[in-house]
Amino acid sequence: MNLQDHAGDIIRKARAMTDIPVETAAQAAGLTPDELAGLEETGVAPRKVNFKAVAQLVGVDGSKLEAVAGGWLPAARDLGLWRELRVVTTASQGMAVNCYLVWDEISREAALFDTGWDADPLFRLIQENDLQLRHLFITHSHHDHIAGVAAVKERFPKLRIHSGSRGAPADQRILANAFIHLGSLRLTNRETPGHSEDGLTYIIGNWPEDTPYVAIVGDALFAGSIGRGNLSWDLARQKVREQILSLPSDTLICPGHGPVTTVAEEKEHNPFF
């Protein structure tokens, strides 16, 4: 799976974060403004880009940005190590989005994290594995992540829904840092606003055979990038640093878009950190 953001996306986000005009960034990059606009749109430039200079200007790491431009990807992960963890990717309107299904191997109790565009692949997975869907956890309320909520609620009317949205019904608003058990698995949450006001990261532990933690982060963090700072760029970056990158280095990061990664890889390779 390709990265959610190419090098041009990263430059565009970093420019927005620092309020650097395209003309100024283009000069640092050794491009014309039109060429930089093309790079930001497609990830491709007609000539060599001075990534380190433009990175220094917009406040990201130049060596890491060069690596992304050169094709860096996080190492492939065998999700079979976690046994009862599945990623389901659906696409619509030119956008692919990930959601995640987790269950306890003994009780078959399951939890869904976001729904993506289409719930039908989830229904098949639940049926194939003879699961009892108990919980739906929402990372944030952007439409691509919750488009299937109505269908899931209709299929599983007793489902408990958990959300950080202020607009959610009172019985759906999850308490910060609350613990929930799913069979032997233990789930908690951390507030990660910035991309959205209601952003939450869910952390799952106590996997069989001491397999590392899993952090389902929504759009707070991508492999090699971060989500757009719709609420606040500074807050988005701060919360990722404090609430996600503070987790153990082998924690599996499961983002809303793009490939899975780890805390260690993002510390080493993400240009924003």
Stretches with model-predicted labels:
Residues 77-128, 200-217, 224:
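Conserved beta-strand hairpin/beta-sheet module of binuclear metal-dependent hydrolase folds
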Residues 196-273:
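Metallo-beta-lactamase
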Residues 1-18:
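A short, Lys/Arg-rich alpha-helix, primarily the initiator
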Residues 21-27, 54:
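Short alpha-helical "recognition helix" segments of helix-turn-helix
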Residues 30, 49-64:
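DNA major-groove recognition helix of helix-turn-helix/homeodomain DNA-binding modules
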Residues 30-46:
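Recognition helix of helix-turn-helix/homeodomain-like DNA-binding domains
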